[in-house]
Amino acid sequence: MPVASRKKSSASNAAKRVDSTQSPSPGEEVSIGTPEKAPKLHKRSRSGCFTCRLRRKKCDEKHPACGACSNLCVKCEYKRPIWWGNAEQRRIQKERIKNKIKQTKMNERNGSATDPLARSRNMAATSPLSPVFDFNRPGHTETYDLFSSHLPTPGLNQTMYAPYAPYEIDVKTERQTFINDVPLRHDSSISTFSTFTAPQLSAPLPTFPSEDWLQDEYFSQAPNLSGIDPAICEQSFGQTYTTLQSNIPVSDHDRPLLDHFIHNVLRIIFPVLEAHQRGHTRAQAILQALETNKCYLHCCLSVAAIHLKTTEGFVGEQIDHDIMRHRFEAVSHLCQALSEDINHEEILDATLAMIFFHCSVGPADDYLPDIPWFDHFQAASNLVNRLGLPTAVPEGNPYVLPPFSMTLTSWIDILGSTMQGRTPQFAHTYRAKHLSGSSSGLRELMGCDDRVMYLISEITCLDALKTEGRIDAMAVCSHVSALGRQLEFTEPVDQTLEHPFSPTTGAIRPEILTKNMTTVFRIAARIYLCSLVPGFDRNQPSNLNLVAAVANTLNYIPSGPNGFDRSLVWPLLITGAFSAPTSQFRAVLAERASLLGDHADLGSFGRMYRLLQEVWRLTDDPADSYYTPEETSSSSASSGSPVPKIERSASPESNSTGSSMREIKKQQVHWRDVMQRNGWHYLLI
């Protein structure tokens, strides 16, 4: 064997002996040439644990728990924890961390950590190798609530912890932002963090803004991409917004429509989601879809043209041509993708956009030809089943939310089924989620608690069974009683109503807002449920009290163009349809409609108010109201006013001679029948 090979082999053997015995000889140390190092326990990440990333703190990444997580008594996780998927659990986590930080500061200020014995005990308690409290595990046994949408609230750990011993560490921080896999920004910095300097206990401790753990907006919005600092996303949002807008391929003729959609339509589509997430995450997703999804793009351009026509007063053949041209292009791309059986997720997004965007901004008397929303939804429900979205999230985990497309589908399915008096497409899924306490994300999207929405689905099923004659009156009353008790379980412990605006900052508080909106939906669901009882009368005291309760709750929900009345279309419809002529609710609704201005005539709100006015006209004074079926068909076909003609009898002789007319009796005209008679295919959500 050559000499060089023997030397290399001996050096390798010496290195192995060093690793096995941990006591190398001097000769072996010379052959290795490097000092001994402790073995690495785990692979370091690029940005630290989840808690340190959100706090924008330096993470030492010790194993199994970093120093910051050990001090704060939280479980050190590098992936998104399950409590992050629920706003209430995020708020509880935030309060616990803030209290722990305040407690630690008070201990430092009072000199509680100066005792060597106490210091050593606390250091042992907060060792990285010691177990940490898991916020995801309940601290005490609680009674299981069948109708609760959240897991039992974890108990608060009362163990006292002191800071680590002084140390010094160099931390290199790298931050990089990607859009469509293209790096837009890269920041790198190296900083030294030292705790060797003892604080002067006689001086007041400074205020550390970052010790608030998470700013409010981080608890109100969850980033879609793990490992991306939300602060960077918010700071660079304006630049990213402009970049994405410029990348959308449109012609010069359609560029004004795109700009109008982005700056005027996009911000009014999801007002509740805007309050919860400040709209940035959803707006970026929509802009990216506009860039890559042709069908989605043409749908949005058509909606923008409709909004321009109704708000800016554009009239003429050109604007109608733009609307129909983009409608045709959207349907053409949709049919092409369906025939090729590709891009199912993009097809689903575009189909849901065709349904929801149009019902958000379209006029009440749109005379241009279009495909009814329920035909679009039939295709969307088939795509949802093909993609397996109803079972995408395992049952029993209330913290993991389903995809956004499934949440939007659930919203349309539950409330849209009441428009047609049929069972929701995914009623079994909602029933299973209700029993397991799983969330569908409806509360953050449209403002109503998921449990109430699940019960509305059950009420709709009962309505469909009654309409089809599959159950008798006794069974209807039994189901109404059972569902009424379940609605009571969804009521909060504290039923006090308060305004959603913060008294100190004036900012909207999404938790209070959704609580008030859920109250309106819950009362409307009870009115809808009671209306199924045989012999129901809108003038009975119980119904009058429920309608008055809705009118009172509306005082705690912001109104006007920047309010949330357009998110309450369904409960306003149900309450108004069963309100008495002298009800205060009608005056409140008229006032809030006037505050909306031009927006009161647009979208679902305008259609809802138009339908209510027609229902009131037919039911409030039925003694001299007559309905002619022939006049309805001719009236609805006209582009002017599809409202059926109401004739007033001038003499008793006219009553006897009108053989083709039939008198509309009180409480015999349902709001759903009025829609069908006039050919109004409304989706009032």
From Swiss-Prot:
GO MF annotation: an example: zinc ion binding
Description of what induces expression: Expression is repressed by laeA.
Record note on disruption phenotype: Increases radial growth, remediates the germination defect of a laeA deletion, and increases virulence in the G.mellonella model of invasive aspergillosis.
Subcellular location: Nucleus
Keywords carried by this UniProt record: DNA-binding, Metal-binding, Nucleus, Transcription, Transcription regulation, Zinc
SUPFAM superfamilies cross-referenced by the UniProt entry: Zn2/Cys6 DNA-binding domain
Function: Transcription factor that mediates stress and developmental response.
Protein name: C6 finger domain transcription factor nosA
Organism: Aspergillus fumigatus (strain ATCC MYA-4609 / CBS 101355 / FGSC A1100 / Af293) (Neosartorya fumigata)
Lineage: Eukaryota, Fungi, Dikarya, Ascomycota, Pezizomycotina
Gene name of the record: nosA
